[in-house]
Amino acid sequence: MQQRRPVRRALLSVSDKAGIVEFAQALTARGVELLSTGGTARLLADKGLPVTEVSDYTGFPEMMDGRVKTLHPKVHGGILGRRGQDDGIMQQHGIAPIDMVVVNLYPFAQTVAREGCSLEDAVENIDIGGPTMVRSAAKNHKDVAIVVKSSDYDAIINEMDANEGSLTLNTRFDLAIKAFEHTAAYDSMIANYFGSMVPAYHGESQEAAGRFPRTLNLNFIKKQDMRYGENSHQQAAFYIEENVKEASVATATQLQGKALSYNNIADTDAALECVKEFNEPACVIVKHANPCGVAVSNSILDAYDRAYKTDPTSAFGGIIAFNRELDAETAQAIISRQFVEVIIAPSASEEALKITAAKQNVRVLTCGQWDARVAGLDFKRVNGGLLVQDRDLGMVTAGELRVVSKRQPSEQELRDALFCWKVAKFVKSNAIVYAKDNMTIGIGAGQMSRVYSAKIAGIKAGDEGLEVKGSAMASDAFFPFRDGIDAAAAVGITCVIQPGGSIRDDEVIAAADEHGIAMIFTDMRHFRH
């Protein structure tokens, strides 16, 4: 039989009061004596519940504007006391056992996220008594239940009903794990906040100091286990951040289809982040984390049709992302034309979902509409370390471009150049993108030499019978030699957009002039590894 412990006395002290009244009512109905502090005690008393203030129980008042409330031997002795071992000393000092502690902590993260939050505001929202009680109860989980999540309230009452008012050791142990996770995450937030300020005391700007603290503490919550990882011999799971502020694959809701795989999630992220770059109705098709077709148009149906035409072979089994609602007509076009792993869009109509439901393996996700992109950090794991950098949210407008060639680009060439520049940002380096009339016609990805990426883009376009002549070409980084320009000219490229910055820029520009190509510098690189 599980080591059951009856719950006869509970201490409740919560900042997030959602569900606490109902939980306290359920405990009282089962004969549990309630201890509480401050606002929680007042709330319970106002609801007519019999509750004893901790200050009355300890005989010691709350003091220092509530800074000292529960830091008392009668509280922590009641929590930490080992049943059957410390009973004598507890009786000697009038310490009653506390069988359950229900605590959640001051809202530190919400406080420091507020605009204009001062250091003093942050300091006053560092909980001391709460984490101390949580850790005490978790340490003594053999005898005490610690509850830090309101989502556990109902399950706890159900188990008490099934066990004559008791909780099993398995449950107490599971609750203790959640408690230690809770305090670890809480302390990490505080450490990150204060750690980010240390360099500021030595003359660095707060903005620079806030990006990269001396010690980086990360907290992610497991959303799901994967059948396997990138390959079948690798185990994997998907973890997400709390309080994600931007529509993303992490916040998306899966409406239908089988469970997402590791590779599905990685590819869906690549597709969604790319389609976010466009304001017009857009479609991005991704395979192995690389766009294989991108287009914008007046409707997502036409955008999909044009994106698909870039590379139908690679689109098979791909991921499709839209920046508008998935409608029935577009859903039908996809299902009728190709095998698709995942479709993600801000929303999906009921009619569209009825159509995609006919294909049980098709996963349909919605992520909600997005506004501005949210700055943050990107991480890359290396053996024994972690590379951390700002998220690449760099963008250029037409007014920021520099035309360095003799020939000026036409309006259409300029539009195509900006379009394929946005796409190139999401193609693995070395990246070359050919585009014409707001659709990709050839994409060369991941080659060790830039000229071979350019050649592959041309081969792709030729294989699909797409006209390259008059197209724009984007390169994610500068051309180190003129050979990439010569290769582009050979297939009919008339406009090139690239960062510039090579020691041979003059040679590259001269090649563009020699071929009558308009060349644009962005002064911004978009390596992607």
UniProtKB/Swiss-Prot annotation:
Pathway(s) this gene product operates in, as recorded in its UniProt entry: Purine metabolism; IMP biosynthesis via de novo pathway; 5-formamido-1-(5-phospho-D-ribosyl)imidazole-4-carboxamide from 5-amino-1-(5-phospho-D-ribosyl)imidazole-4-carboxamide (10-formyl THF route): step 1/1; Purine metabolism; IMP biosynthesis via de novo pathway; IMP from 5-formamido-1-(5-phospho-D-ribosyl)imidazole-4-carboxamide: step 1/1
Q: What is its EC number?
A: 2.1.2.3, 3.5.4.10
Q: Keyword Transferase: yes or no? A: yes
Q: Which CDD domains match?
A: IMPCH
Q: Does the keyword Repeat apply?
A: no
Alphabetically sorted, this entry's keywords are:
Hydrolase, Multifunctional enzyme, Purine biosynthesis, Transferase
Q: In its UniProt entry, what is this protein called?
A: Bifunctional purine biosynthesis protein PurH
Species this protein is from: Klebsiella pneumoniae (strain 342)
